[in-house]
C-alpha cells in the first residue's frame, strides 16, 4: 500500500508514541476514545426501546439512567426511589453519594422515571432500590443489584468501545462525557459528571485536536 493511501488508526499511533519521551503527548484527552460511537449508542437505544420481559425492562432502565446521568457503577446500583426530589426550578432529581463520599444530585428525566415505574410494575415489590436482580430459574428472591451484577449485564450487551474493547459500565460514562464536552463545553460536562473542577474534565475528555471545517465556509466548491 502506498503512503498516500495508508492511514494509521489514531489509537495505535498514540499508544506507539506514548513510549517516546522525546515527544511527550498532550495531557488532554486521556479518556478520548474509551466511550461508544454515536452509532453504537443509537443501536443500544433502539435495541431496548420495546421491552417485554423483566430483564428487557431492566436493560432499558439501566441504559437510560447510565447514558443520561454518567454515574459510576457503584452509584447506579445505590439509587433509591426515596431519594427522588423536586428541584425549585421543577426538575426531578435523585440524590446519591458519589466517589469521595460527597452528596450529589443528578437530573432524572420523565422518560427515565416512567421507564423505572414500568419496570417495577412487572412484579410485586416494595423495594426502594431502582435496580434489582432477576429471580432466574431458581426463583431466588429479588435483591438490590450488585456492582458485579451490573458489570455482567452491561458486558452481555456485547458491543465494543471506539477502541475495540468490550463494553463495561464506565464506557457509558465516557460516552456521555465525550458528547457533552463536544457539545456543551467543559463547565457543563464537569457539572453533570460532578467533577471537582472543569480542569479535571478537560484533562480526561478534551479532544487532542479540533476540526475547524465545521465552522469555515470560505470555499464554495
Question: For each of these PLM feature ranges, what is it?
Answer:
Residues 41, 110-163:
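Active-site/catalytic core of tyrosine-dependent DNA strand-transfer enzymes
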